[in-house]
């Protein structure tokens, strides 16, 4: 829609101006209290179009995230092909959408590996942004990243 395009253009402008936009989360909107339900095909199509638009309008260093628990798993590859490059915190409870359980990381690995995608743990700050962190915080984030890298898959 025109409103989404305008919002994405504003975000792109802010990124070019200030350079501090780490990610944009693209997910279906659900009213508070609505029972859990699968995305309809029109909702999926609308969200995929928004992802494509976001990837075209936002600078490449801005990650696009979608929570995999809000997609039908068999349609998640389409979101990745459209431009998603971050699945967020998949190993935790979704505190924003608690009615939607997170898929197991192994389930996601099995789905994505044959398509050439790799599931990788990361800190809440993307690596490209570490140089902007204060030294003490950067050291802590690097320590957390080493722990994540050494954890069993």
State the predicted function of each range.
Residues 2-153:
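Auxiliary Fe-S-binding modules of radical SAM enzymes
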């Amino acid at each position: 829609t025109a409103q989404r395009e305008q919002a994405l253009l504003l975000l792109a402008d802010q990124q070019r101006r200030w350079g501090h936009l780490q990610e944009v989360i693209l997910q279906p909107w659900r009213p508070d209290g609505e029972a859990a339900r699968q995305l309809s095909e029109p909702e999926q199509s609308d969200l995929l179009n928004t992802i494509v638009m976001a990837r075209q309008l936002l600078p490449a260093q801005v990650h696009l995230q979608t929570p995999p628990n809000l997609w039908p798993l068999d349609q998640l590859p389409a979101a990745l092909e459209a431009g998603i490059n971050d699945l967020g915190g998949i190993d935790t409870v979704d505190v924003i959408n608690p009615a939607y359980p997170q898929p197991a990381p192994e389930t996601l690995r099995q789905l994505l590996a044959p398509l050439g995608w790799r599931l990788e743990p990361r800190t809440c700050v993307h690596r490209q942004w570490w140089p902007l962190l204060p030294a003490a915080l950067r050291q802590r984030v690097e320590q957390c990243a080493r722990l994540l890298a050494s954890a069993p898959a």
